[in-house]
């Protein structure tokens, strides 16, 4: 089978959402996800699952959406003018996890499928996705393990995949106005279709399935680390970068808002609490300073 099959993709995505939510509930140990099913007037809908006030996770959102429309939004046709005049179908699972403990990194993952149709023409389709890690306090062990997990899931698809998608992630999750990366990266891919549907779908599944395998050990390792108000305030300050990136640069956020997507689901990635501070400068020699100097820039984490 090499023709695109959106039914197959949707079944995988719904199962992935279910498995990730179960895994996060097990990690948290107390809180449960609340599900909010929704429909979109223009076509499609989804189910948003949100966990709040947990022992480990302050907020975790895992969203499935499947939307369709008769014409493409400006955010899509700007990059792909050949899509103008086509109907479209977009589906995906997107998640963001904001832990309580500043020693546990925030993380984001997304896997998605897009297909556009036009009478008398072949469909235009592709997969996209990835995952990335945003630590507040620098633990080299965690970052190396995260990138090793990313590299391992890429290896069956070719030796060039990890370095290419790792670089793409570094470049995508970058805040030009801050001149820093959002975190320590991971994988990012888009427009994936050149290898045909089966191989492209298999890679997307590997990324989706690999997320919790990469993240759970870091949570287990850091969840009982003692912290105080100083660390909490720094975490809230650094969360501001998440807000800045998502509202100014993130293509998925812009696409969702321009297509009349569900605002609550689109903005599910926002941290529940955040703060800004004028001209913040970390204390020299501190762990906070090490984050800025050593972690918020692209690095080859596997050959240090």
From Swiss-Prot:
Location relative to the cell: Cytoplasm
PANTHER family, per the entry: COPROPORPHYRINOGEN III OXIDASE, MITOCHONDRIAL, OXYGEN-DEPENDENT COPROPORPHYRINOGEN-III OXIDASE, MITOCHONDRIAL
Upper lineage: Bacteria, Pseudomonadati, Pseudomonadota, Gammaproteobacteria, Alteromonadales
A Gene Ontology BP annotation from the UniProt entry: protoporphyrinogen IX biosynthetic process
Source organism per UniProt: Shewanella halifaxensis (strain HAW-EB4)
Enzyme class of the recorded protein, top EC level: oxidoreductase
GO cellular component: cytoplasm
Any one GO MF annotation of this record: metal ion binding
Name of protein: Oxygen-dependent coproporphyrinogen-III oxidase
Disulfide bonds: none
Cofactor(s) named in the record: a divalent metal cation
